[in-house]
């Protein structure tokens, strides 16, 4: 008898029918690179990009199943850049992480010409051979840009890789593709979007943003900032997260570039969680070529530095939030805000603990206002100062996205009579904010202090398990 089984595509994956064993494999096969309708709104139709940067994406076929989509990206500057990066704290640091660290240390953050990225294979836990592969990628880009070094330890290109851990790169494919990508370098929006696509793995949409701004010393001069990032799973950062490349045409001294990036990352990429895992490859790099001219930012005490710090941090937060919105199988974007803590660090630890809790995440997926799970996570938060969490002073509420009054769940340790119908309506929305107050709640007593910590995270769904169960296929 002819099968009447039906298939449907959701979020770029094909939904499979029940197997003969009665099990359901929800989203097991990548359908194509089409972008889900719900994600289209996050993709820019145009952009204003920093002067002097050229980008491209090209197809190498790093994964054999990828027969046509770009999986190698180049981001190059026409002139040498100042550069800084933050890297994963995972002990098994991937080969590209080690090579990029070496490039920055050898050059002391100067003379950097660009970044080469491949998706489909992480080149992590691949031994000496993997290290040589990463070095060859860097050297190949230098060769294409006309800046080859006689010393293989002194290349000028950073390297990033993302994909399956424990497998060697098909290095010949990548080295053969780098010249093709170089020949396609361009500065237009299409080129930036193609490069952003090339670094994706299980992402359902490319993550790209750009901004134009001014600085106090040059109020009539336009500066630009652009960034791309990738990530949808294995995301819970520690010193960095995912892959991110930020480029600006502001002239910035290498000595202040690192504190600029570290501050921005600590309040953005280090404040998101999808599944609690910290990758072996996490890298966020910032390149500044000074092509827009004006005064060079050389000290952390200058008005330009202060302004740039705010601009970069806000920009990085917007990029990081796109990663959460593309969490594997996610249906919710959740902000957790912990207020009135004695320190920012303790507030962030508590927010992070809530964001990592599988019970909190699954309750939100089920649209269940089970605030006891939030309290439980607050209570077992590790490494915070004694007396930070006092049950009798703790309040929890849901803050709706429509601007209406917060739904109070717990006030000063006392449970509220929760309007379950209103709670259900709030949890129907894609966006939600959880507010935890460690001070005096509605009594207005600030109690322990006024520091705040924020984390962004998503829920856990059936699809997350299936996507990751089938990752290597």
Swiss-Prot record:
Catalyses which reaction(s): N(2)-acetyl-L-ornithine + L-glutamate = N-acetyl-L-glutamate + L-ornithine; L-glutamate + acetyl-CoA = N-acetyl-L-glutamate + CoA + H(+)
Gene Ontology molecular functions: glutamate N-acetyltransferase activity; L-glutamate N-acetyltransferase activity
Mod. after translation: The alpha and beta chains are autoproteolytically processed from a single precursor protein within the mitochondrion.
Keyword Acyltransferase part of the UniProt annotation: yes
Record's subcellular location: Mitochondrion matrix
GO cellular component: mitochondrial matrix
Record-marked site positions (Involved in the stabilization of negative charge on the oxyanion by the formation of the oxyanion hole): 162-163
Pathway: Amino-acid biosynthesis; L-arginine biosynthesis; L-ornithine and N-acetyl-L-glutamate from L-glutamate and N(2)-acetyl-L-ornithine (cyclic): step 1/1; Amino-acid biosynthesis; L-arginine biosynthesis; N(2)-acetyl-L-ornithine from L-glutamate: step 1/4
Residues binding substrate: 201, 230, 241, 328, 468, 473
Miscellaneous: This protein may be expected to contain an N-terminal transit peptide but none has been predicted.
Similarity comment text for this entry: Belongs to the ArgJ family.
Protein name: Arginine biosynthesis bifunctional protein ArgJ, mitochondrial
Organism: Blastomyces gilchristii (strain SLH14081)
């Amino acid at each position: 008898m002819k099968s009447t089984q039906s298939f449907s595509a959701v979020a770029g994956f094909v939904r499979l029918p029940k197997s003969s064993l009665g099990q359901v494999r929800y989203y097991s096969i990548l359908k194509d690179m089409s972008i889900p309708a719900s994600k289209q709104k996050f993709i820019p139709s145009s952009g204003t990009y920093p002067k002097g940067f050229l980008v491209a994406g090209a197809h190498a076929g790093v994964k054999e199943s990828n027969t046509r989509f770009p999986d190698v990206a180049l981001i190059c500057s026409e002139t040498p850049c100042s550069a800084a990066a933050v890297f994963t704290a995972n002990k098994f640091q991937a080969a590209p992480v080690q090579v990029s660290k070496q490039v920055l240390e050898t050059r002391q953050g100067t003379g950097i010409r660009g970044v080469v990225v491949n998706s489909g294979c992480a080149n992590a836990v691949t031994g000496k051979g993997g290290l040589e592969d990463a070095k060859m990628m860097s050297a190949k880009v230098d060769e294409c840009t006309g800046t080859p070094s006689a010393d293989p330890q002194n290349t000028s290109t950073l390297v990033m890789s993302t994909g399956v851990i424990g497998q060697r790169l098909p290095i010949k494919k990548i080295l053969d593709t780098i010249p093709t990508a170089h020949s396609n370098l361009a500065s237009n929006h299409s080129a930036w979007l193609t490069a952003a696509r090339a670094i994706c793995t299980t992402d359902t949409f490319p993550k790209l943003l750009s901004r134009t701004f001014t600085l106090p010393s040059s109020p009539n001069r336009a500066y630009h900032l652009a960034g791309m990032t990738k990530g949808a799973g294995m995301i819970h950062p520690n010193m960095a997260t995912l892959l991110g490349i930020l480029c600006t045409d502001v002239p910035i001294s290498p000595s202040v570039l690192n504190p600029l990036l570290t501050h921005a990352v600590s309040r953005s990429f280090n404040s998101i969680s999808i599944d609690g895992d910290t990758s072996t490859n996490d890298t966020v790099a910032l390149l500044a070529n000074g092509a827009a001219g004006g005064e060079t930012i050389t000290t952390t005490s200058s008005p330009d530095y202060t302004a740039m710090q705010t601009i970069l941090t806000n920009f990085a937060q917007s990029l990081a939030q796109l990663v959460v919105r593309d969490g594997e199988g996610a249906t919710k974007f959740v902000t957790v805000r912990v207020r009135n803590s004695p320190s920012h660090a303790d507030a962030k630890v508590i927010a992070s603990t809530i964001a990592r809790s599988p019970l909190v995440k699954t309750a939100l997926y089920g649209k269940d206002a089970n605030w006891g799970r939030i309290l439980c996570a607050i209570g077992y938060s590790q490494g915070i100062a004694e007396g930070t969490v006092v049950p009798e002073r703790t309040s929890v509420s849901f803050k709706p996205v429509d601007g209406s009054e917060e739904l109070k769940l717990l006030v000063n340790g006392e449970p509220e009579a929760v309007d379950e119908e209103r709670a259900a309506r709030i949890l129907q929305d894609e966006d939600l904010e959880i507010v935890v107050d460690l001070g005096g709640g509605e009594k207005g007593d600030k109690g322990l202090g006024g520091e705040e910590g924020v984390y962004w995270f998503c829920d856990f769904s059936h699809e997350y398990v299936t996507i990751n169960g089938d990752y290597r296929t």
